[in-house]
From Swiss-Prot:
Gene3D superfamilies: ATP-grasp fold, B domain
Binding residue positions for ATP: K169, R175, G176, Q197, K198, Y199, I200, K210, C211, D212, T255, N256
Site (Essential for specifying initiation versus elongation step of the polyglutamylase activity): R175
Domain of life: Eukaryota
Binding site for a protein: R175
Name of the molecule in the record: Probable tubulin polyglutamylase TTLL2
Binding site for L-glutamate: R236, S258, K278, K361
Tissue: Highly expressed in brain, kidney, liver and testis. Expressed in heart, lung, muscle and spleen.
Origin species: Mus musculus (Mouse)
Region: Disordered, residue numbers: 479-499
Keywords: ATP-binding, Ligase, Magnesium, Metal-binding, Nucleotide-binding
Binding site for Mg(2+) 2: E343, N345
Length: 540
């Protein structure tokens, strides 16, 4: 097919699911193998602070990375900095070409409940109610208090004796903290900035228990806008049976595991749900299929919702380079099988509270790293004869000693190779590429590889797959608007416009989904054009 296939045409393929069983591929244990012939490279280096999840550190060590030690390593001698708190502007400006940060700037527009509500309301007024009807009616307090009161009493008059239900959430808090569910306005209390939303009274129940979905989304860049959705995920259950007659029973109405793991029924074997309060997403979809539900259609609706949500805030993201971010989208399914966006979580929890967490989150972190640093360099080394005979299978743990590419997305980004082939005496080059560090070994090897590939380039014609160019060593994605730019010689900045890889591990590309959306996002976002393409897709 000419061009990247649409989500609608290849839903099963996009999500990597067979027609029957819909099993999700698990990350396999890593094994150690001998290094191939040639000068060995030291491991890549990750940097942490006190907020870095222990699971992230554990996974990186499993993959053969080293932990940064400021006492014995150069201040710039690291490749990945993963922490819970956001980075300062100076850290974004000074990030080096071989480094990655796990946050984009300006993400509160997506993860703060009041900011998200404002952006979605703006998109709804501009592009129509029907397109953005996946969020409940929302009021921001105290700004919208008068509007809310008017709506409350109008609805009360329309419904007569039938109650209406609302939920009030703090704009900045998570894990179910500070939430109030009410039907009587006299019970509404708030201090500070809150959002009040129409409470969804008809959730899809599993064995009479309410649940929601934690969908993991990774945004690897904003120029072009590049969104991946994880095939696996979590389904979180309330631990008491759903009952609108008792709005104060949070174990019945809230699905946050931080609350329900403390409930009296957490360890009990509950109807259908079983013990605990979590399922894997694949188990949930298997349950739906047993009731003749088209789970692929539901997945497709969720992917559209994610794209539309990110589009609401993407134009406001400042220019940054070498960043990525993992988000947790919380989605509730009602009894009409309509998905509703509840909120988007910054730093989704990576704690391991149960065996379901272990199976999902450990693979998730592995696949985030896989998404960022696939072993493309190792495959190129093999072409150049650097792999020892009989060692055609290379483990991920060892391949990461030599890898350093972004998603293998066949782009024309300026690479680390291109930057380091300039004059070694150039002060700018010396500043960007310090000598005698772990990463300096990597840069030197990449330079040798570049010279070899240049000699062989004329002998072979690259094979195209759909609209992707051949895989090559590339830079991480760029981002979008521009309050500031990275400093340094022109050669150290990635070019815009690379075509993303369609998957990595269990992550699948959901945007861009065709040539038109790629062109509409590679040099700044043409939101109107993207919306038009998405509407075509949704109307098929």
């Amino acid at each position: 097919m000419d061009g990247l296939q649409s989500l609608g045409d290849v839903t099963a393929e996009i999500f990597g699911l067979p027609l029957e069983g819909h099993s999700v591929q698990e990350s396999k244990p890593l094994k150690t193998e001998d290094e191939p012939q040639g000068a060995p490279l030291k491991p890549l280096v990750f940097r942490v602070d006190e907020s870095t999840p222990g699971l992230v550190q554990s996974v990186l060590l499993e993959r053969g990375w080293d932990k940064f030690d400021e006492q014995r390593q150069d201040v710039e001698d690291w490749n990945l900095y993963w922490r819970s708190s956001s980075f300062r502007r100076a850290e974004y400006v000074n990030v080096k070409p071989w480094q990655r940060l796990n946050h984009h700037p300006g993400m509160t527009n997506l993860t703060r409940k009041d900011c998200l509500a404002k952006h979605l309301a703006r998109m709804r007024s501009r592009y129509g109610e029907s397109l953005y009807e996946f969020t409940p009616l929302t009021f921001i307090m105290p700004t919208d208090y008068t509007k809310f009161v008017a709506k409350y009493f109008k609805e009360k008059q329309d419904l007569g004796t039938k109650p209406s239900y609302w939920i009030c959430k703090p704009a900045e808090l998570s894990r179910g903290r500070g939430i109030i569910i009410f039907s009587d306005i006299r019970d509404l209390m708030f201090k500070g900035t809150y959002v009040v939303q129409k409470y969804i009274c008809n959730p899809l129940l599993v064995g009479r228990y309410k649940c929601d979905l934690r969908i993991y989304v990774c945004i690897t860049g904003f120029k072009p806008l590049t969104i991946y959705m994880y095939q696996e995920g979590l389904v979180r259950f309330a631990t008491e049976k759903f009952d609108l007659r008792n709005l104060e029973d949070y174990y019945s109405h809230l699905t946050n595991s931080s609350i329900n793991k403390l409930g009296a029924s957490y360890q009990k074997i509950k109807e259908v749900v079983g013990q605990g309060c979590k399922w894997t997403l694949s188990r949930f979809f298997s349950y739906l299929r047993n009731w003749d539900v088209d789970d692929l259609l539901l997945r497709q609706k969720i992917s559209h919702m994610v794209i539309l949500t990110v589009l609401a805030m993407a134009p406001s993201v400042p220019v940054t380079y070498n960043c990525f971010e993992l988000f947790g989208f919380d989605i509730l399914i009602d009894d009409n099988l309509k998905p509703w966006l509840l909120e988007v979580n910054y730093n989704p929890a990576l704690t391991l509270d149960c065996s379901t967490d272990e199976s999902v989150k450990r693979s998730l972190v592995h696949d985030v790293i896989e998404l960022l640093y696939l072993n493309g360099l190792r495959s190129e080394e093999k072409k150049c004869g650097r792999t020892s005979p009989g060692n055609s299978v290379v483990s991920l743990a060892r391949s990461h000693h030599h890898e350093f590419c972004a998603t293998p997305n066949s782009s024309s980004y300026a690479s680390l190779i291109e930057f380091t082939t300039g004059s070694k005496s150039d002060p700018a080059v010396q500043n960007i590429c310090p000598k005698h560090t772990r990463t300096s070994q990597l840069r030197e090897m990449m330079s040798r590889r570049d010279r070899l590939l240049t000699k062989e380039a004329a002998k072979s014609k690259p094979r195209h797959k759909a609209w992707h160019l051949p895989r090559k060593m590339v830079f991480p994605y760029a981002s979008q608007s521009q309050p500031h730019k990275m400093k340094g010689p022109a050669g150290d900045l990635p070019e815009a416009g690379s075509t993303p890889n369609d998957h990595a591990g269990n992550f699948v590309l959901i945007f861009p989904f065709n040539k038109a959306t790629f062109r509409a996002s590679r040099n700044g976002l043409n939101v109107k054009r993207i919306i038009q393409e998405l509407q075509k897709l949704m109307n098929k």
